[in-house]
């Protein structure tokens, strides 16, 4: 199975927002309360469009990945695998692509954060070797060394 990361097009914001809402609504709503207007503005103002990629496997869209380069690392803002494709080890394969890209670019780490209440995501990232580097009541920051 061939994984492709295809950068989103400028006219795809509504689709991206729909996927982000589907993937994060329950966690954001439980912690902060969900507000569509706030979340739209946040995505438009705090994230660069070129950080977002559709995830394709065998030419079928299976999810959305948002990550950015910084310092000597990549930071994964979100990985959403569509519900019908979950529990098929696709998330791990996508993260392996990110890890390999980081190594190819000479980056030593991949970092991310997760809601503390998102237990399945935390189990997933820890199973890939991610270690908690910071925590507070609602979030954990995690990091994986991918190169020395």
Model feature map: region roles:
Residues 112-122, 138-143, 147:
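Conserved beta-strand-loop-alpha-helix junction that forms the acyl-donor binding cleft
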Residues 81, 87-100, 123, 127:
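Conserved acetyl-CoA-binding loop-helix of GNAT-fold acetyltransferases
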Residues 102-114:
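Conserved GNAT acetyl-CoA-binding A-motif
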Residues 68-77, 86, 108, 136-139:
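A conserved beta-turn-beta hairpin within the catalytic core of GNAT-like acetyltransferases
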Residues 21-44:
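Conserved GNAT-fold acetyl-CoA-binding loop/helix
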Residues 43, 125, 130:
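Conserved active-site tyrosine of GNAT-family acetyltransferases
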Residues 3-18:
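A short beta-loop-alpha structural element at the N-terminal edge
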Residues 54, 60-68, 75-80:
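Conserved beta-strand in the GNAT
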């Amino acid at each position: 199975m061939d994984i492709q990361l295809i950068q989103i097009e400028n006219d795809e914001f509504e689709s991206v927002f729909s996927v982000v809402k589907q993937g994060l609504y329950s966690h954001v709503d439980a912690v902060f309360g969900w507000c569509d207007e706030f979340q739209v503005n946040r995505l438009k103002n705090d994230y660069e469009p070129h950080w977002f990629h559709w995830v394709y496997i065998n030419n079928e869209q299976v999810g959305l990945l948002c990550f950015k380069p910084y310092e000597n690392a990549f930071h994964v803002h979100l990985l959403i695998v569509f519900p019908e494709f979950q529990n098929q080890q696709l998330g791990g394969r996508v993260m392996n692509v990110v890890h390999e890209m980081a190594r190819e670019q000479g980056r030593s780490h991949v970092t991310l954060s997760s809601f503390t209440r998102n237990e399945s995501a935390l189990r997933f990232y820890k199973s890939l070797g991610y270690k908690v580097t910071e925590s507070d009541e609602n979030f954990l920051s995690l990091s994986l060394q991918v190169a020395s």
